[in-house]
Amino acid sequence: MKKVYSKIESINGSVITVKADGVSYGELAEVQTRFGASLAEVNKLEGDLVSLQVFAGGRGVSTGDEVRFLGKEMQVSYSEDLLGRIFNGSGDPRDSGPALKDNMIPIGGPSVNPSKRILANRMIRTGIPMIDVFNTLVVSQKLPIFSSSGEPYNELLARIAMQAEVDVIILGGMGLKYDDYLYFKDTLEEAGALSRTAMFVHTAADPTVECLMIPDMCLAVAEKFAIAGKNVLVLLTDMTNFADAMKEIAIIQEQVPSNRGYPGDLYSQLAARYEKAVDFADAGSVTVLAVTTMPGDDVTHPVPDNTGYITEGQFYLKNGRIEPFGSLSRLKQNVNGKTRDDHRALMDNMIKLYASYKDTLEKKSMGFMMSEWDEKLLKYGAKFESGMMDLSVNIPLEDALNLGWKILAECFTREETGIKSELVNKYWPAN
């Protein structure tokens, strides 16, 4: 029989403290208030004093309310019925569908044993040239999208969700504005992609503690789908909101703050989520792509700074485009030698020419006279930005490579490209 405690020692915001024994860290409890029952989670143990984070917040909680410990950690339902559905950070439906209570699985478990993993060796096609051609997304990779506020990172995630060649999409939203939540819902529904998608959404108006549940729920469900043989892409936005929720709760708990007020375990908390990316030897895979906004466009901010040490590269979103010089996929060399024989050479030389174009723009802004070569670079840069960097471009990898050759042919002679003659002879457009 579960014990019921009817005396709350203290209430500090959404954190309550009770005296109890036989309780474990992370255990769920039910707090019965005059407004109804609310879940709470144990987040601190100090002798017989147990601190709990109340999901619905501390408003309406009084010291005489009952607290009943449930003897289990937070769980989420797993089945094919998740697809096409939308849930909040407590696992309850946000849509008009029924609550799912069968086949409950724990969240926040350990990452997969390395002996069960295989090396990343397959690409995920997205139809976005700046990803497929220049910074290939690889199965089981963990990548952040570094972005400033105001950049179209949610639009980019929605496009990837619609176009990525995977079996299942798990979309996790943390601190979303309600308009952004509706954008994801409506966009995926209209594109017919919601049927292969499960959404777990925490909006800015929801309790803070639910924000911390979103990544764990997404990754727990994704891992189960992967074990069942599915290739799963987990899309998370925004990990900075997740870190800010950690910071808020740490302050309430009076933890000693670290860099800019974030808790000292920020790195390990982020790593615990990203390390769930996996490619099983005899099953499916989990790939993680997560937006990390940079306050003030500051890449040294603790959240993007710590993230960079965990992940396998990054996409850097700037001025509405994936910036080629700030972006990097450290695993692309595992797959871009298997796509087409011109992939690597074309990728390297197009970026090299684009760097020369940027230098030419700087010379032009300083009033230098433009040479014939400079004029070619200016023409090339404009075509490269509109044909390759524009995020509205949606073409398969092979068509993107052909477009790359077409752009080169319109701006340069064969000899000026710097690409091996055998590749030029094979792929140079006829006219």
UniProtKB/Swiss-Prot annotation:
<protein>
    <recommendedName>
        <fullName>V-type ATP synthase beta chain</fullName>
    </recommendedName>
</protein>
<keyword id="KW-0813">Transport</keyword>
<dbReference type="GO" id="GO:0005524">
    <property type="term" value="F:ATP binding"/>
</dbReference>
<dbReference type="Pfam" id="PF00006">
    <property type="entry name" value="ATP-synt_ab"/>
</dbReference>
<dbReference type="GO" id="GO:0046933">
    <property type="term" value="F:proton-transporting ATP synthase activity, rotational mechanism"/>
</dbReference>
<keyword id="KW-0406">Ion transport</keyword>
<dbReference type="GO" id="GO:0042777">
    <property type="term" value="P:proton motive force-driven plasma membrane ATP synthesis"/>
</dbReference>
<dbReference type="InterPro" id="IPR055190">
    <property type="entry name" value="ATP-synt_VA_C"/>
</dbReference>
<dbReference type="InterPro" id="IPR022879">
    <property type="entry name" value="V-ATPase_su_B/beta"/>
</dbReference>
<comment type="function">
    <text>Produces ATP from ADP in the presence of a proton gradient across the membrane. The V-type beta chain is a regulatory subunit.</text>
</comment>
<comment type="similarity">
    <text>Belongs to the ATPase alpha/beta chains family.</text>
</comment>
<dbReference type="Pfam" id="PF02874">
    <property type="entry name" value="ATP-synt_ab_N"/>
</dbReference>
<dbReference type="InterPro" id="IPR004100">
    <property type="entry name" value="ATPase_F1/V1/A1_a/bsu_N"/>
</dbReference>
<keyword id="KW-0066">ATP synthesis</keyword>
<dbReference type="Pfam" id="PF22919">
    <property type="entry name" value="ATP-synt_VA_C"/>
</dbReference>
<keyword id="KW-0375">Hydrogen ion transport</keyword>
<dbReference type="InterPro" id="IPR027417">
    <property type="entry name" value="P-loop_NTPase"/>
</dbReference>
<dbReference type="InterPro" id="IPR000194">
    <property type="entry name" value="ATPase_F1/V1/A1_a/bsu_nucl-bd"/>
</dbReference>
